[in-house]
Amino acid sequence: MDQDLQEPEGGLTPHLTIRDRRAVDAIDFYRQAFGADEVMRHPAEDGRLMHAHLKINGASLMLHDDFPEHHGARASDPAGVMLHLQVDDADAWWNRAVAMGATVIMELADQFWGDRYGQLEDPFGHRWSIGAPIARN
């Protein structure tokens, strides 16, 4: 694979730890719910996923299974972390994510700041917000 294609895009790349050896399931969910493209994956010898790089909505997202034996951070309940998707059609992105099993935290609705916005939790415990400018007539 071309090394340039594997480079993260954007100035900040979230790197998620997925509990319970479910990183491969998370890739499938992000592909179906958020239209993720898989750039690469690197499995560990024991079958866990050591590293994966996805692209969602033009930005990079990296993830891996939990590796506590390497003294990495144990996946905890996310506190204060929200992954935001700014899109053209919030309803389409929202409906696809909910259909794939995301849990609604804050209903998608028109907000005072001018976006249609809502919050979801994916099946792996990570919180996402989806927003799009409210269409003006």
Give the residues covered by each predicted segment:
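Vicinal oxygen chelate
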Residues: 1-17, 27-88, 92-121, 130-137
